[in-house]
């Protein structure tokens, strides 16, 4: 079972066992000790976002939703391992960028539009900017990152912007 995870993640067997222990700790009444007995268990988002690695993150719900196959934010062990794998230090920039894009695309239209940027900014600044400041920042981001001039950021625009952010890889990660 664990070899399968080793093949498609950035983890070794020890890491995967540690992740299973963490998953079990989140909901011991739901998750069996021996995962092979009941592999499709969904741990609710409300428990996942209480993890120390996510608790203070302003995007915790969006992060969990991005990895949730059921679309409700509930995670299976597969989803949980995927989340930690993408957010680990070993994951490549393009993989991290694709999930970051999903997280910031609040309206799920496959673009990061002005409204998505406003929601992102509100979370990052804890709504401390006034409306004019928010509009100014969002306009500036679109002006600088919108390569094709359509008034929104497609994935290529976003990826180009991320490539210019040297701290992206070091900030878009969590440790197990």
Curated annotation (Swiss-Prot):
GO biological process: calcium ion homeostasis; cellular response to ATP; positive regulation of cytosolic calcium ion concentration
Xref: PROSITE patterns: EF_HAND_1, EF_HAND_2
Organs and tissues of expression: Expressed in liver, heart, kidney, brain, spleen, stomach, ovary, testis and muscle.
Gene Ontology cellular-component annotations: cuticular plate; cytoplasm; photoreceptor inner segment; photoreceptor outer segment; sarcolemma; stereocilium
Additional notes on this entry: The binding of either calcium or magnesium significantly increases the structural stability of the protein in comparison to apo-CIB (calcium- and magnesium-free form).
Subunit annotation: Monomer. Homodimer. Interacts with WHRN and MYO7A. Interacts with ITGA2B (via C-terminus cytoplasmic tail region); the interactions are stabilized/increased in a calcium and magnesium-dependent manner. Interacts with ITGA7 (via C-terminus cytoplasmic tail region); the interactions are stabilized/increased in a calcium and magnesium-dependent manner. Interacts with TMC1. Interacts with TMC2.
Record Pfam families: EF-hand_7 (PF13499)
Recorded superkingdom: Eukaryota
Domain EF-hand: 55-90, 92-127, 133-168
UniProt keywords, alphabetically: Calcium, Cell membrane, Cell projection, Cytoplasm, Magnesium, Membrane, Metal-binding, Repeat
Record carries keyword Calcium: yes
Known role: Calcium- and integrin-binding protein that plays a role in intracellular calcium homeostasis. Acts as an auxiliary subunit of the sensory mechanoelectrical transduction (MET) channel in hair cells. Essential for mechanoelectrical transduction (MET) currents in auditory hair cells and thereby required for hearing. Regulates the function of hair cell mechanotransduction by controlling the distribution of transmembrane channel-like proteins TMC1 and TMC2, and by regulating the function of the MET channels in hair cells.
Protein name: Calcium and integrin-binding family member 2
Listed InterPro entries: CIBP, EF-hand-dom_pair, EF_Hand_1_Ca_BS, EF_hand_dom
GO terms assigned for molecular function: calcium ion binding; magnesium ion binding; protein homodimerization activity
Localization per Swiss-Prot or TrEMBL: Cytoplasm; Cell projection, Stereocilium; Photoreceptor inner segment; Cell projection, Cilium, Photoreceptor outer segment
Residues reported in the UniProt entry to bind Ca(2+) 1: 105, 107, 109, 116
Keyword rRNA-binding: no
Binding, Ca(2+) 2: 146, 148, 150, 152, 157
């Amino acid at each position: 079972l664990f070899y399968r995870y080793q093949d498609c993640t950035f983890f070794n067997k020890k890491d995967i066992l540690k992740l299973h222990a963490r998953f079990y700790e989140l909901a011991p009444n739901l998750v069996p000790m021996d995962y092979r007995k009941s592999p499709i268990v969904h741990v609710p988002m409300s428990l996942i976002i209480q993890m120390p690695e996510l608790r203070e993150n302003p995007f915790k719900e969006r992060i969990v939703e991005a990895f949730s196959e059921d679309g409700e934010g509930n995670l299976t062990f597969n989803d949980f391992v995927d989340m930690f794998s993408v957010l680990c230090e070993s994951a490549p920039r393009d993989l991290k960028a694709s999930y970051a894009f999903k997280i910031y695309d609040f309206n799920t239209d496959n673009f990061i539009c002005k409204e998505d940027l406003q929601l992102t900014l509100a979370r990052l600044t804890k709504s401390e900017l006034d409306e004019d400041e928010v509009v100014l920042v969002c306009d500036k981001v679109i002006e600088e990152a919108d390569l094709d001039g359509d008034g929104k950021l497609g994935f290529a625009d976003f990826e180009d912007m991320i490539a210019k952010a040297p701290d992206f890889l070091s900030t878009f990660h969590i440790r197990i």
